[in-house]
């Protein structure tokens, strides 16, 4: 695997072949991340200090786009440089929005105001039309929080970045079947902490109270209630937001971590059908994280999964 970094002035600096690397892609809840290591000449090291954008290429295909957060050089007979950073979501996370209130706001307006100005031009939105009659943006929240919050409000999929840097607002379409013979290891986890089973929304304008419960989560023996207040006549939006908050809080209730040899071809949000009798995991899961790693000797792929809703 090789890569290159770009400077603010447009200079493209090719990098030597990586001696070790780790690429992590997520479903958009957090930023993707990378760490690569390679031998360096002293003249290249000086140029690398100006690099801000990072691209990794494997087999002729772009497998990661991101920003360089940190560079480290070690000298012992020769220079070895380590670059690490985040995916393109970092551009949205590092820029805050001013306070604003919108009426009849649609997805394209959100992208024009909070996404495209930060150099993110490749965008694919599926479904919709995604719009809401009223939304407030608190001052000081990040542009990523604005985009994520709008998508939750209107019921759009969670935004995420493809390996080639495309911002995708769409549901996963890939499907995979995995069994014990495909894995090096598997870890199952049940975590009830933070799970919400009931969300009440109090409308300050009408005095109405909407209650949303999840009987499936209650069957786990969990009793956890949250309150929220809203104003305005959009009760259906409040209830939809309540369901979204319950679903978001339950994301980590039932999770799996699978490790496989080599590089496994998959995308975050793809569906995985598992057959792991030893862990009593014989159902559908959704990929939330993909970590490809090469330690200098062998390559492995780790998949983070959550139970499919």
Question: Which positions does each model-derived feature cover?
Answer:
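Acidic, small/polar-enriched beta strand-loop surface segments
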Residues: 1-5, 148, 152, 160-297, ...
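Short intrinsically disordered coil segments
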Residues: 51-53, 98-104, 182-187, 216-218, ...
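Oligomerization/assembly interface segments of phage tail-like spikes and tubes
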Residues: 25-42, 79-90, 201, 252-260, ...
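Charged- and aromatic-enriched interaction segments used to assemble
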Residues: 80, 84-193
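Assembly/oligomerization scaffold segments
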Residues: 1-96, 152-155, 160, 173-189
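Extracytoplasmic
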Residues: 18, 31-33, 63, 78-80, ...
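Short, acidic/charged, Gly/Pro-enriched secondary-structure junctions
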Residues: 1-8, 39-73, 103-117, 261-284, ...
């Amino acid at each position: 695997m090789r890569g290159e970094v770009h400077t603010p002035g447009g200079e493209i600096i090719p990098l030597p072949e990586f001696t070790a690397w780790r690429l992590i892609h997520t479903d958009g809840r957090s930023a993707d991340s990378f760490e690569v290591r390679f031998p360096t000449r002293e003249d290249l090291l000086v140029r690398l200090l100006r690099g801000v954008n990072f691209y990794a290429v494997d087999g002729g295909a772009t497998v990661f786009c991101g920003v360089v957060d940190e560079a480290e050089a070690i000298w012992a007979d020769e220079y070895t440089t380590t670059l690490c950073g985040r995916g393109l979501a970092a551009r949205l996370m590092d820029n805050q929005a001013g306070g604003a209130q919108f009426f009849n706001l649609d997805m394209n307006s959100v992208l024009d105001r909070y996404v495209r100005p930060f150099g993110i031009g490749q965008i694919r939105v599926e479904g919709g039309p995604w719009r809401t009659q009223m939304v407030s943006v608190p001052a000081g929240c990040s542009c990523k929080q604005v985009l994520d919050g709008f998508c939750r409000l209107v019921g759009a999929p969670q935004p995420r970045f493809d390996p080639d840097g495309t911002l995708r607002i769409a549901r996963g379409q890939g499907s995979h079947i995995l069994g014990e013979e495909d894995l090096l290891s598997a870890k199952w986890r049940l975590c009830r902490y933070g799970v919400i089973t009931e969300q009440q929304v109090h409308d300050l304008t009408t005095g109405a109270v909407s209650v949303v419960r999840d009987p499936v989560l209650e069957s786990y023996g969990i009793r956890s209630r949250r309150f929220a207040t809203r104003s305005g006549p959009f009760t259906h939006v409040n209830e939809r937001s309540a369901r979204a908050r319950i679903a978001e809080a339950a994301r980590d209730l039932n999770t799996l971590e699978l490790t496989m040899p080599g590089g496994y071809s998959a995308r975050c949000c793809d569906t995985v059908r598992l057959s792991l009798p030893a862990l009593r995991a014989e159902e559908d899961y959704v990929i939330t994280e993909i970590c490809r790693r090469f330690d200098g000797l062998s390559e492995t792929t780790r998949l983070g999964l959550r139970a499919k809703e």
